[in-house]
């Protein structure tokens, strides 16, 4: 176990499935690791309340941050409010191994400050159309893992997963991506394996 927890940033546009992924990760990882969560919303603590309501973790392990402005700023240019939440969790739970930091919904230009996140997951969803991967932006091109979510909606919105696969490979080079459906859990094992492998986590 390292002296500092692994911090995993989870970003992506509004409605892409960040909170659903955070919930799924908590449910799968809470028995393996000493785990906590920070969520970001502009004017509310809605995502934190959702996680508490769904018993993702004990309530005291979840901190909801109200950014009061552009969610991008709170995870990149001035991450102090999030860094304070991380410090608070570290003080509250000595020996923390993993902190998930979920950003507020933002556009394709959002990225995490390296001061705040050791690994970044960027979540997009199929319902926005199969053109999204080729639009690029730091989240799509530079995140450690791109999660293409809600693949069950592809036939309903006329999106081609083959096109998204091709464009994701072209935009990301050697960086990995995964197709997922949080309703069924598809892709979750791959996401967890990535976090454990890249974050050098060893389950108790």
UniProtKB/Swiss-Prot annotation:
Q: What superkingdom does the record give?
A: Bacteria
- Where in or outside the cell is it found? Cytoplasm
Q: Keywords in alphabetical order, please.
A: Chaperone, Cytoplasm, GTP-binding, Nickel insertion, Nucleotide-binding
The record describes its quaternary structure and partners as:
Homodimer. UreD, UreF and UreG form a complex that acts as a GTP-hydrolysis-dependent molecular chaperone, activating the urease apoprotein by helping to assemble the nickel containing metallocenter of UreC. The UreE protein probably delivers the nickel.
Which Gene Ontology terms of cellular component type are present? Answer: cytoplasm
Q: What is this protein called?
A: Urease accessory protein UreG
Q: What is its main location?
A: cytoplasm
Q: Does the keyword rRNA processing apply?
A: no
Concerning its family, UniProt says: Belongs to the SIMIBI class G3E GTPase family. UreG subfamily.
List residues binding GTP.
Answer: 12-19
SUPFAM superfamilies associated with the record:
P-loop containing nucleoside triphosphate hydrolases
**Gene that specifies this protein:** ureG
Q: Which GO terms describe its molecular function?
A: ATP hydrolysis activity; GTP binding; GTPase activity; nickel cation binding; zinc ion binding
Q: Which SMART domains match?
A: AAA
- Please give the function described in this protein's UniProt entry: Facilitates the functional incorporation of the urease nickel metallocenter. This process requires GTP hydrolysis, probably effectuated by UreG.
Could you give a single Gene Ontology term from the biological process aspect? urea catabolic process
Q: Does the keyword Ribosomal protein apply?
A: no
| Segments traversing the membrane | none
InterPro entries with a match to the protein in the record? AAA+_ATPase, CobW/HypB/UreG_nucleotide-bd, P-loop_NTPase, UreG
Pfam entry (one): cobW
């Amino acid at each position: 176990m390292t002296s500092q927890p692994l911090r995993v940033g989870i970003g992506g546009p509004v409605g892409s499935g960040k909170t659903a992924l955070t919930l799924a990760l908590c449910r799968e990882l809470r028995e393996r690791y000493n785990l906590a969560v920070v969520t970001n919303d502009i004017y509310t603590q809605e995502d934190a309340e959702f996680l508490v309501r769904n018993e993702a973790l004990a309530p005291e392990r979840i901190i909801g941050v109200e950014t009061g402005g552009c969610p991008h700023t709170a995870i990149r240019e001035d991450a102090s409010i999030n860094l304070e939440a991380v410090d608070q969790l570290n003080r509250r739970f000595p020996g923390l191994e993993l902190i998930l930091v979920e950003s507020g919904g933002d556009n394709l230009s959002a990225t995490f400050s390296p001061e705040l996140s050791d690994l970044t997951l960027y979540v997009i969803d199929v319902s926005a159309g199969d053109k999204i991967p080729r639009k690029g932006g730091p989240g799509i091109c530079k995140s450690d893992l791109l999660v293409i979510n809600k693949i069950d909606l592809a036939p309903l919105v006329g999106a081609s997963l083959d096109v998204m696969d091709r464009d994701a490979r072209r935009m990301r080079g050697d960086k990995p991506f995964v197709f997922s459906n949080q309703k069924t859990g598809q892709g979750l094992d791959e996401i967890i394996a990535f976090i454990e492998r890249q974050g050098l986590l060893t389950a108790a």
